[in-house]
Regions:
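Active-site-adjacent "subsite" loops/lids of carbohydrate-active enzymes
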Residues: 32-38, 107-179
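The substrate-binding groove and active-site-proximal loops of carbohydrate-active enzymes
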Residues: 39-47, 79-89, 151-166, 227-239, ...
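Catalytic domains of carbohydrate-active enzymes, especially glycoside hydrolases
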Residues: 51-75, 178-179, 287-289
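Aromatic-lined substrate-binding rim segments of carbohydrate-active enzymes
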Residues: 72-111, 234-253
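Aromatic- and acidic-residue-enriched segments that line the glycan-binding/catalytic groove
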Residues: 79-86, 114-150, 188-222
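Glycoside hydrolase catalytic-domain groove-lining segments
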Residues: 209-330
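Substrate-binding cleft of secreted/luminal carbohydrate-active enzymes
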Residues: 286-302, 309, 317-386
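Short, compositionally biased P/S/T/A/G/V-rich stretches that sit at domain boundaries
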Residues: 369-406, 414, 496
């Protein structure tokens, strides 16, 4: 048995024994007619939307996911028994009908703590009940935001209060149970600024749970205070514990529904200030894919951000980079960012936002940015890859092997996926690909009817970035047959 101290967790995936290469026969397998890629866009508008025409143009441009804002802690864009409804229409139903008509998944965007778009009466009641966040100096969230240059006319609930956590649980589960969503995409699942939160509830809970003797609040936990690090740890645990509660409830209710996150890009800031240690959330299996908000003006900066984040993920789940179309504005830099992201091994992209994207869609089609139909990586069968140690690793977390080296793997194939049906059969081809998508070699074909663990190996001569892939077909328990493609975390062949 090979020692495998490092593993590639291939998000919904399947790869089997690899021992030698043979010529590719693409037409023998329907999966070769596709690529594996999530192509999405965030729709942050809170106005009425022409959902049918929007989904029609997105579909024609090759998009397969949308992330529409649907609710916050203060309002919902659909009828709710828990949240006040804004607008006159059930926007979520209209969105789902249109998106599913065109084969597009809907991952409803949920903002957990902010009372955004909510009526003044709700804001007032929450503040009177002491349920909102307060800064170090006792100022409410809206005034703290002003200090950082943000004019926000709403308050934010404190996640240390059980009634606020129950509110989040209740309205998210109401959405999951009442609507046929494909996923729930969390945004702002964090604190927004460093001086938050220092309310009385945070004080009482921190003292109780830490067992520390606090003599000067909040000075003891602020800046150079003796218990600052303990308080930051407590804030991070406060946030992840809430994520655990709600994602477990969603997955227990309906395993098909994906949970995902609009992750913050600045790793130090999100760790210390936001209390959003999202890479730990990934390691605990709380998310089904992640979409870091890697907004930048230049394509090269976009890829630089990806390189910083890759070592924290290492293929544990699909990575869909957040492309800031609103900042790049023109088509060419957006196109280049997507191409560079593909080249380094991201699994797809999500653009921000729809208003900036729509004027570019004709150019998307003309340039063939999404020319091949795409299969969603997060809907493929699940597999874990265990890769032997090479002794070298790049800054992106890629294992580095010398040209001509034999790379040994162990693969754990599981007959489960984020689907509405179970899986009864999986068959297809294991191939070696470049990160650009070019298939280098077909390695072996398999036909399985049960979970399998296999040892495998492959030899690569030419320098470059590679991914193992399974181009396959799965038979579901209801008889449906679906193609899928799944890929490993990249590895590098290099003589340097």
């Amino acid at each position: 048995m090979n020692k495998c101290p490092f593993y590639l967790l291939v998000f919904p995936a399947l790869i089997l024994s690899l021992t030698g290469c043979s010529n590719i026969q693409p037409k023998a397998n329907p999966a070769y007619d596709y690529v594996a890629e999530g192509r999405g866009t965030w729709l942050s508008t809170k106005m009425e939307t022409d959902w049918d025409s929007t989904m029609a143009v997105l579909s024609k441009a090759g998009f397969n996911m949308v992330f529409p804002f649907m609710c916050s802690a203060g309002s919902a864009r659909y009828p709710s028994k828990i949240l006040p409804m804004v607008g006159q229409r059930d926007e979520l139903t209209l969105c789902l009908q249109a998106a599913h008509k065109y084969g597009i998944e809907v991952h409803a965007l949920v903002v957990p703590w902010k009372l955004e778009s909510g009526p003044d009466s709700v804001q007032k009641r929450m503040m009177e009940e002491g349920r909102t966040q307060f800064g170090y100096d006792g100022k409410p969230y809206s005034q703290v935001a002003l200090q950082f240059g943000y004019r926000q006319n709403y308050e934010t609930l404190c996640p240390s209060r059980e009634d606020n956590r129950k509110l989040l649980y209740d309205y998210v589960m109401e959405l999951a149970k009442n609507y046929d969503v494909d996923g729930i995409n969390f945004d702002h699942f964090r604190f927004s600024f460093e001086p938050l939160c220092y309310c009385n509830n945070c004080k009482e809970n921190f003292i109780k749970e830490s067992g520390l003797k606090i003599t000067k609040w909040p000075d003891d936990v602020w800046k150079d205070g003796p218990y600052r690090e303990a308080y930051l740890d407590w804030r991070r645990e406060l946030m992840i514990s809430s994520v655990r509660e709600i994602t477990k409830a969603i997955h227990d209710y309906n395993p098909y529904i994906c949970t995902s996150l609009c992750a913050r890009r600045q790793l130090k800031v999100t760790y210390e200030i936001d209390a959003q240690e999202w890479w730990k959330w990934i390691r605990e299996g709380l998310l089904d894919f992640v979409a870091p908000m890697d907004y930048s003006d230049e394509p090269e900066e976009y890829v630089h951000l990806i390189k910083q984040q890759f070592p924290l993920i290492k293929g544990a789940l699909p990575y869909y980079g957040g492309v800031g179309v609103f900042r790049m504005k023109e088509f060419e830099p957006v196109k280049k960012a997507i191409e560079l992201g593909r080249g380094i091994g991201e699994d797809g992209y999500v653009t921000f936002n729809i208003n900036s994207l729509l004027p570019l869609l004709e150019q998307f089609k003309a340039a063939g940015v999404n020319s091949l139909p795409a299969l969603l990586p997060h809907r493929a069968p699940e597999t874990r890859f265990y890769v032997e140690s090479s002794g070298r690793e790049s800054e992106e977390g890629f294992k580095i092997f010398a040209p001509g080296s034999e790379v040994n793997f162990k693969v754990d194939v599981m007959f489960k996926a984020k689907l509405r049906q179970g899986i009864s059969r999986i068959w297809g081809d294991v191939v070696l690909t470049k990160t650009s998508g070019e298939i280098v070699a077909k390695i072996k074909s398999f036909d399985l009817n049960e979970a399998t663990i296999a040892n495998l190996s492959v030899t690569c001569g030419e320098e470059g970035l590679y991914r193992l892939a399974f181009y396959g077909t799965m038979t579901l328990s209801n008889g449906d047959v679906r193609p899928f493609i799944t890929k490993s975390f990249p590895f590098e062949i290099s003589s340097s």
